[in-house]
Amino acid sequence: MPNLRPLAIALGLGLATLVVTDASAAPKKKAAGRAPAVSAQCSDFYDATNAGWLKANPVPQTGATTALGQLAERTRVQQRELLDGAMKSPQGNVQQLLGDFWASGLDEAAVEADGSKPIAPLLTRINAIKKAKDVPASIAALHQVGIPVAFNFAPDIDLKALDRHIGYFMQGGMGLPDPAFYTRTDADTVALMGRYRNYVKQILALTGTKPADLDAESQAVIALETELARNAQSLAGINNPFNNYAPISTKELTSRYRNLQLDAFLKAQGVNDDLVSLSDPALFKQLDGMVTRIKPEQWKAYLRWRVGDAMAPYLSKAYRDAEFEFRGRVIRGETIAPARWEQVLDAINVAAGPMVGREYAARHLSAEDRRQAAVIADKIRETQIEAVKANTWMSAEAKSEAQAKLAALKIEIGTPLRDLDYSVQPMGRGSFGSNMLIASTWRHREEMKRIGKGNADRRWDVLPQQPALAYDIAQNRLIVTAAVLQGPVFNAKSDAADKYGSYGALVAHELTRAIDAKGSLVDAKGELRSWWTPADKTAWNLLGNRVAAQFSGYEFPGVKGAKVNGELTREENLADLAGVELAWKAYLAAEPDAKPATQQGFFRAWASLWPQQVSPNEAAQRLTSDTMAPGKWRTNGALSNLPAFGATYSCKPGQPMQRVETDQIQVWR
């Protein structure tokens, strides 16, 4: 399916809940005295605000339940309703396509009767391979329909010219998520490889391999993938964008790797640019040799397997069951397959997500919602510019650069500014698998159009129907999806305190990214250039150290005896604090005469974003991997640094929700 960049910028949903106060912040009392009562708001604002939610949502046996997770679930139901409507009464060409796609996926009898027919043309082409020179053309044809084999090829930012995308040739073509699995010899990996071999056999049998040949062909497939893995980077290496950036002219590319016929490959993908990136010459030299060294029969088995594996979730039950038993249970750790409608929705979002997003925004995002969201985002930006001017830790040079970058920042709300070309081969309702290939081919075509100068902003790395609020560092833009503009993040009918405390604070959280340690690596013109002075870096690190120390003192809910990892969560915690600081300033500017009772709504709105209930197993996993602090501390940790919170709720310095002045951390206030 389409080889898209990971959607790593979606809004984090975080963790969960036990009642713990910051005992270290409480003043010492004489033994004989009796401590005065501390209000619930000044003791634990998270619990005081979210008591009703926490009671209504008990700790689950597995996974997590969160307020923002419930928002994500609601958007999926909204998408289902949209597709039901498109199926019954389509309005326009895009809805006709989506309605047919949806109907074909829900018709399980038709999917079962279809068997392997949707991929039959692809298998016929593969089986027609006679010589080594036929292999590259088959590789290119599969990439065209969104099934990357042998290697990956996808558009991404040109790191020396952020206004353009280039095509990246990278390692790929392996059926396991980590290349190390193919070469490790520990007992767990050996057991995993045994189950993987069985899965390969099942798919090969379904795609035409005779029973007598299954052992030999499955071994041939794994041998080919192992050869790819031996020359691949580690996962840590491949996730570093600078490790993958190595520009090369397409002319030189063709002369270096003649067997792979990469010039013909690029033409087949519709790419005419004169520059690509290929950072693993040893890997591609090896692959170039494999084209002629490996027998056509082995290539045919490998390509049939890759087609069957990629399409298995969208074909008959035999395919789906085999895929779920290995990828679902073993790789993803799932115990039960999702409901059919959820499987079909996921498939449509993979292949035709932008189409769904276009219709979703038209249905669920009003002009007034968009207008109000834009006004608040602009107010936050203005507030941040003024805060930069006034702050004491930034150098004059950095202040000038930061103001220029914030002034140039683009704000896109609801959907991307640039729409896509929705001309697609007509779909019917008789073959879900065939529709999947039609949509996947369209998605791949639109992805390839991103390559070239001036195309870098053609789409977002998140879909409009996914609740997300994100800063795109390469394009210096704030992205606010249509789906995120609903409760608990945004309600156009609520008062200003509510909107600024939730949506406004999240906007400010993201805008801080434009000028923080990472944002300072790209300037207002989109050039990779560090514009912080050494003194700026030192000042930011000192702020981060203080925040890390604060959060490291908090107990981790759900894991007995554990503390929050302040170092792991420091950047998110800094952005949270900056977010509530800026949003509060912007709110006061918008509502200067608001009474304390009204102002309290700002802080309740922030707390209402983060209620979470997490199972013990999930909490243990997140303790060591989650860069977001638990919801209790995202609420209390940030607010306890704000004098305005203490003033609004009459909290005294030293009480859990009001750190003493010398301990308070400030980023922009």
Q: What is each stretch, according to the model?
A:
Residues 48-52, 56, 74, 78, ...:
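Structured segments of extracytoplasmic/periplasmic soluble domains
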Residues 2-26:
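Gram-negative bacterial Sec-dependent N-terminal signal peptides
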Residues 221, 256-259, 277-284, 338, ...:
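Intrinsically disordered, low-complexity linker/terminal regions across diverse proteins
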Residues 86-379:
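Noncatalytic, helix-rich "gating/capping" subdomain that lines the substrate-entry/channel surface
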Residues 24-37:
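Cleaved targeting-peptide boundary
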Residues 34-55, 182-205, 570, 577-582:
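Hydrophobic/aromatic-rich, well-ordered segments within soluble, folded domains that form packed cores
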